[in-house]
Amino acid sequence: MAAQVTTSTDKVLRQPILGSRRFSNMLWASVSAIGGIGFLLAGLSSYFHKNLLGVSDPSNIQFIPQGAALTFYGVAGTLLSAYLWFVFFLDVGGGYNEFNKETGKVTIFRNGFVGKNRIINFQYPLKDILSIRAEIKEGLNPRRVLYLRVKNRGDIPLNRVGEPIPLAELENQGAELARFLTIPLEGL
């Protein structure tokens, strides 16, 4: 888990948000690429009766049904790996939260998938911010999220999606943000 570096001055507070550029995503993309290419080469070796894989000799395997299954799993693993690398390089979900007292605006910026809505950028006036709300649910699927309560809008999540952040870090982030914006902190 990478440490979150919050940039703060008297007038601007900027919190970077970690998206899909995580070590775990890179690890899974690499593992699925190695496995997918290995299965694909093993399946093609059984079809062409020629060894394309340097580690073993799968050319003696019958293509129907074992070689076809190996080829199918190889294509599936390679496509999964390509998708994971694509999401990794786009940094889907990454961005920042910026609270600027100079301009009087809150900016919530996130990267999305390629397309019409590639960049997600919400801006709200500081006067419309009502409070910071912390939601903490423990159990099998724990959830620890900070929300920005905006007038005439729904609650906007402020932290990353995925693994829940430690409770102490959530409390510190919420308190720092509430102190900076001089608004109440709810839910703790």
From Swiss-Prot:
Signal peptide, first to last residue: none
Gene name of the encoded protein: ycf4
Function (record text): Seems to be required for the assembly of the photosystem I complex.
Organism: Picosynechococcus sp. (strain ATCC 27264 / PCC 7002 / PR-6) (Agmenellum quadruplicatum)
GO terms for biological process, alphabetical: photosynthesis
The keyword rRNA-binding belongs to this UniProt entry's keyword annotation: no
Transmembrane segments: 26-48, 68-90
Any one GO CC term of the record: plasma membrane-derived thylakoid membrane
Keyword check for Transit peptide: no
Database matches in Pfam families: Ycf4
Record-stated family: Belongs to the Ycf4 family.
Keywords of this entry: Membrane, Photosynthesis, Thylakoid, Transmembrane, Transmembrane helix
Subcellular location, record wording: Cellular thylakoid membrane
Protein name: Photosystem I assembly protein Ycf4
Membrane topology of this protein: Multi-pass membrane protein
InterPro entries xref list: PSI_Ycf4_assembly (IPR003359)
